[in-house]
Amino acid sequence: MLGKGIKKSWGWLGLTVLLLGSPCGWAAEFSASFKGTDIQEFINTVSKNLNKTVIIDPTVRGTISVRSYDMMDEGQYYQFFLSVLDVYGFSVVPMDNGVLKVIRSKDAKSSSIPLANNEQPGVGDELVTRVVPLNNVAARDLAPLLRQLNDNAGAGTVVHYEPSNVLLMTGRAAVIKRLVDIVNTVDKTGDREMITVSLNYASAEDVAKLVNDLNKTDEKNALPSTMLANVVADGRTNSVVVSGEENTSPCAVEMIRQLDRKQVAQGGTKVIYLKYAKALDLIEVLAGNGTSGNRNSSSTNSSRPSSTRSSSTLNNSNSSSSGSSSGSGSSSSSSSSSMGFGSAFGSANSSGGRTIVIQGKEVTVRAHDQTNSLIITRPPDIMRDLEQVINQLDIRRPQVLVEAIIAEIQDADGLNLGIQWANKRAGMTQFTNTGIPISTAMIGTDQFRSDGTLTTAYASALSNFNGITAGFYRGNWSMLLTALSSDGKNDVLATPSIVTLDNMEATFNVGQEVPVLTGSQTTVGSGDNIFNTVERKTVGIKLRVKPQINEGDSVLLQIEQEVSSVAEGNGSSNSSLGVTFNTRTVNNAVMVTNRETVVVGGLLDKTAIETNNKVPLLGDIPWLGSLFRSKTQTMSKRNLMLFLRPTIIRDPQQYQQASISKYNSFNNEQQQQRGQGNSVLDNNTLRLSGGNTYTFRQVQSSISAFYQPEGR
C-alpha cells in the first residue's frame, strides 16, 4: 500500500487518507469531498481524523458542500477545516487544555482568543488577538481606517487605547498580519525639520497667526498635515519656529522673511478696549512706571506754550542705556526691566492723556472713560511693544473672601458696702468710693427742711448711684448706709466677612453711633439755659483688610480690626464723667495659606481689685468695726480671640459656590433660631428680565442644580 491512495466512502461522505513512507516514519495526507453534508457531521469527521476533541455550540447548524482535489498534510487539513467554517460564519477557538470549541464568528471575539506576537503571529484563518504599539501616529486616527479592512461583521474588531497609544486587533491570523504590515508602513516619522527665524521688524505673534491662517482650509479642501508647515511664535525673543517637511519648510520661511520688513514711518491711531483694567489707571502705569532708558524733556502741544512736561522712554528688552532727567529741576533713579517707561511725565490734559517717548518717538495715550478704552497715537513700528505691556496688565484679577471670627467672653463681679457717720459739731467719716458722700446727703437734707425741694443736692447725689442707700439725720448726728452687688456677663461672637479684589483695600463697618457729652455751658438771661456739646462715637465692628495673593496660593493680609462697645454699668450718656468704651484693636500683617484659618490676636485677662477704707482703731474693733469700714471688691475675667480665614476666588463658579454656602449657613441658623418655618428670604421675590418673578429659594435651587454633576 506504500505510495498508493486508499479511498474509503461513507454513503454521501467521501474522505481519502493516504499514508506515505519516509525515512523518519509515516505521514498522513488527506483529501476531502463533502456534498450536502451536515456541518456537525463534518466537524466530527475532522475531529476524528485529527484526533482532536471538539465542542460544538448548539447554534452551529447547516449543511456544507466542499471538494478538495489536492492532497493535504495535517496542518493544511486543519487550515482547510478553519476556512470552511469561516465561509459558513463559524470559528474555532482553541482552549488551554487542547480542546477546540466551534462557535459563531460574531461570538468568538469575546472568547479567550490566543494572543499573538511577532514570533508567533498565527497561521491562516485561526483567530488571534494582536496588540500593536504606535510611535508616530495617533491610534485614535488610525483605528477607523483599519476597521474598514477587517471582518467587522464576524470575529474581527479593531479598538484603540489612547493613554498608551496602542491598537488592539482581533481577527483571522492572515488578516491581522496584513493589518500589522499596514500599520508598520504608516507608523513612520516624516522627514521633518525645525527652523528658527528671528524677526527684526514684525511681531512674532502676528506673523505666526498669519502663516497658520493661510494654511487653514475647509474640510473638503484640507491638505494632509505632512504637506503643511507649523509656525509657533516665541514672544520672548521675537522669533518664530517653523516645523515641517523639507519641501514645505522653505516656502514658509520665505514667506516669513517677506513679511519681516521695515514699515514706512507714518503716524497712526489705534483704539484698545480694556477688559478689566481701568483706562485712567493704566495711563498712569504706562507713563509713570520708571525703568531703564533716557528721559528727555520737551514742550507740550498745548495751547499754552509756557507749560512744560517731561517724557518717558521705552527701550527694547535687549538694549540698555542710562540718562538723566531735566526740565523740572528734579531727578530720580530708575530700575531695570524687560520693557520700561520713564518715571517722569507731564500733566494730564482734559481727556486724561499722556505724551511719552518710546524709542525716541513720541506716543500719545488718552483714556476714554465711557468705553474704558485707550486711544493711542504712535508710529506703527512700536505699537507691538505697547500692546504687549497693555495685554499683560489688562488681566482678570482674582478676589479674596476674608472671613473673621471674633469670640469674646467677659465676666465681672463687684461688691460695694460701707457706712458713713457725721456730726455737725464733731466731724464725719466719709468714704467717697461708696457713690454718695454723706456730706452731700446732709446738704440735701438741710435744703429739704428749709424749702421742701429735692431738685439740687439730692438730685445730684442720687443721679449716678446704683444700689440701695439708707440712713438717718437727727439733731447733729447722721448716718448713711450704701450697698451694691453687681454681676455682669458679656458674650460676643461676631463673624464678619468681606470680598475684595487682589491688592485692593476693603472696609467693613457694623455698629452704632453713641452720643458723648464733651462740654456744657449755661447761658444767662430770662432763664438759665444749659447748652451741651455732644460728639458721636461709632462703636461696633470695623474690619479693614488688603489681601495680596502670592505664589503657591498663599495670601498676605494687611489687617486693621477694631471691636468696640459701651461698657456695662457705666453706659449712661448723661453721666458726669461720660461714657466708658471697651476697645480691642489689631493692626498687623500675616501670611496665610488659602482656606486655612489663622489666629491673628488673642487676650486672656483676669483682674481682681479689692479696696478697704476704715477709720483707724474704730474700724478694727470686732463686730462693731463694720460700722466704721467701707469695702469695694471687683473681679473681672476676659477671653478674647480673633481668627481670619482667606479664600481665593479665581472664577465665577467659585464665587457662586461661596455665595450659596453663605446663604445656606444664614438660612440654617435662622431656622434654628425660629424653631421652624422658612427663611425670611424665601418669601422675598426677585423680578428678573422678561417680567418673570422668582423667590430667592427658587433662584438658589436653580443655581445648585446647574452646578450639580450630570447623572445624579
Curated annotation (Swiss-Prot):
Keywords: Cell outer membrane, Membrane, Protein transport, Signal, Transmembrane, Transmembrane beta strand, Transport. It holds the Pfam family Secretin_N. Its main location: membrane. Residues 28-124 are annotated as: N0. Residues 267-394 are annotated as: N3. Residues 126-190 are annotated as: N1. Gene3D superfamilies: 3.30.1370.120. InterPro entries: Bact_Secretion_Sys_Channel, GspD-like_N0, GspD/PilQ, NolW-like, NolW-like_sf, T2SS/T3SS_dom, T2SS_GspD, T2SS_GspD_CS. Residues 399-651 are annotated as: Secretin. Residues 1-27 form the signal peptide. The record marks G511 as: May serve as a pivot that allows opening of the central gate for substrate egress. Residues 653-712 are annotated as: S domain. Residues 191-264 are annotated as: N2. It is found in: Cell outer membrane. Disulfide bonds: none annotated. Residues 288-342 are annotated as: Disordered. GO terms for cellular component: cell outer membrane; type II protein secretion system complex. Forms a cylindrical channel with 15 subunits. PANTHER family: PROBABLE GENERAL SECRETION PATHWAY PROTEIN D, SECRETIN GSPD-RELATED. Involved in a type II secretion system (T2SS, formerly general secretion pathway, GSP) for the export of proteins. Required for the translocation of the multiple pectic enzymes. This subunit forms the outer membrane channel. NCBIfam families: type_II_gspD (TIGR02517). The N0, N1, N2 and N3 domains are periplasmic, while the secretin and S domains form a channel that is partially inserted in the outer membrane. The N1, N2 and N3 domains each form a periplasmic ring. The secretin domain forms a double beta-barrel structure; the outer barrel has a diameter of about 110 Angstroms while the inner barrel forms the central gate with a small pore in the closed state. This is Secretin OutD. The gene is outD.
